[in-house]
């Protein structure tokens, strides 16, 4: 993985993904020991779209590893306003840093960036396409809650059309297999066909599509809530009509298993009531912490800096 870009998780083997999760656990329990792992390294955060958690998470990850951070938050602060291409920006920034993370509203922008850069590029979300590091955070949370990331019934609820975190998670869970997906959405926000095709191509995975959350919540091990994304709509009336379709509150949670985990990539609007936050099934703020840890694992890995005392799960496989 050293020197490699991470645009999607498809470029990583399942063992490499598991090792990143294992490495994140190690980092969490060895904060002081790993604090100088990336001394002298510089991360560039190129965020052409607004972000709070993801950008701060990437930046904090590098700072906690001993490195430094440069970058911008908002396309209006970049030379794109002067007409500069993504490729030219990446060719330039590559001369300054050891690793780049990019968020962009256009699908495929991260791939363009990775091809232009001379240093590793990590995709922090490209339009409605993929969000690989959020998926790593999701997997780390499932691993922490259940001790596994297979043999689960996973409900995904809300905006399944534009939700890049949903697409990334489904595709990655299919690689590990033995997952039943329950896709909960209005007809206007159904899962894209290419994601459905991915499920169908996996013998050990299956799916159902439903509109009513209450009718299926009792069957779920995991409920992955998403917001309806206003920024993806061209018509505000459509957004307002669909925004309140699914709201998870304590009343609905009474129908769920005591062991169910509620995940959300954040930010939320109103799709999870605040009173759910104190329920032990609420795992979305754990995801935030896990997101920073997996980004620490990924950043240190792609620049080739070894964590002191860490032993990989399978050295030959994960170093490929």
Model-derived segments and their meaning:
Residues 199-276, 281-282:
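Rossmann-like adenosine-cofactor binding region
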